[in-house]
């Protein structure tokens, strides 16, 4: 028989840098999860992903054990990395902060494809391009 699921915890943690400090510690502590064990496993699994922010979904079981699934980094994080900028524009319609090529958009869309609700690469690319435009990043050929 499968273990009884007690809850899910969704967090976004920098790759390889999970610590028992907030927000990780309190979120796991209230479900009775072994915080040190989670941070060790998460850091080992994401150590090769640099400074990207990694979304993680932790499944907590009734016996206080857990499992977790890491997702692909959020699209804005990947766009900022591709454009080498710190943040998007405060006024995306008026002030453009960077440019991104279609090839870079395609690369990001291919990486994000498992987590996107898109049927094809073209629709995934239009989602990523829309995110870029809303950040004040111009999509060029």
Swiss-Prot record:
SMART domains: RL11. CDD domains: Ribosomal_L11 (cd00349). One or more lysine residues are methylated. Keywords: Methylation, Ribonucleoprotein, Ribosomal protein, RNA-binding, rRNA-binding. InterPro entries: Ribosomal_uL11, Ribosomal_uL11_bac-typ, Ribosomal_uL11_C, Ribosomal_uL11_C_sf, Ribosomal_uL11_N, Ribosomal_uL11_N_sf. One of its GO terms (cellular component) is cytosolic large ribosomal subunit. The keyword Transmembrane helix does not apply. One of its GO terms (molecular function) is large ribosomal subunit rRNA binding. Coiled coil: none annotated. GO terms for biological process: translation. The keyword Transmembrane helix does not apply. Belongs to the universal ribosomal protein uL11 family. Part of the ribosomal stalk of the 50S ribosomal subunit. Interacts with L10 and the large rRNA to form the base of the stalk. L10 forms an elongated spine to which L12 dimers bind in a sequential fashion forming a multimeric L10(L12)X complex. Forms part of the ribosomal stalk which helps the ribosome interact with GTP-bound translation factors. NCBIfam families: L11_bact (TIGR01632). This is Large ribosomal subunit protein uL11. It comes from Agathobacter rectalis (strain ATCC 33656 / DSM 3377 / JCM 17463 / KCTC 5835 / VPI 0990).
């Amino acid at each position: 028989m499968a273990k009884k699921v007690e809850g899910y915890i969704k967090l976004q943690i920098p790759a390889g840098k999970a610590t028992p400090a907030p927000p990780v510690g309190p979120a796991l502590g209230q479900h009775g999860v072994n915080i040190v064990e989670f941070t060790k496993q998460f850091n080992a699994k994401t150590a090769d992903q640099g400074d990207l922010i990694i979304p993680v979904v932790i499944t907590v079981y009734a016996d206080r054990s857990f499992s977790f699934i890491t997702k692909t980094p959020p699209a804005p994080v990947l766009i900022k990395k591709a454009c080498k900028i710190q943040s998007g524009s405060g006024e995306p319609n008026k002030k453009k902060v960077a440019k991104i090529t279609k090839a870079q958009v395609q690369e990001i869309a291919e990486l994000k494809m498992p987590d996107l609700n898109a049927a094809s690469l073209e629709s995934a690319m239009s989602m990523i391009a829309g995110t870029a435009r809303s950040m004040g990043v111009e999509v060029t050929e």
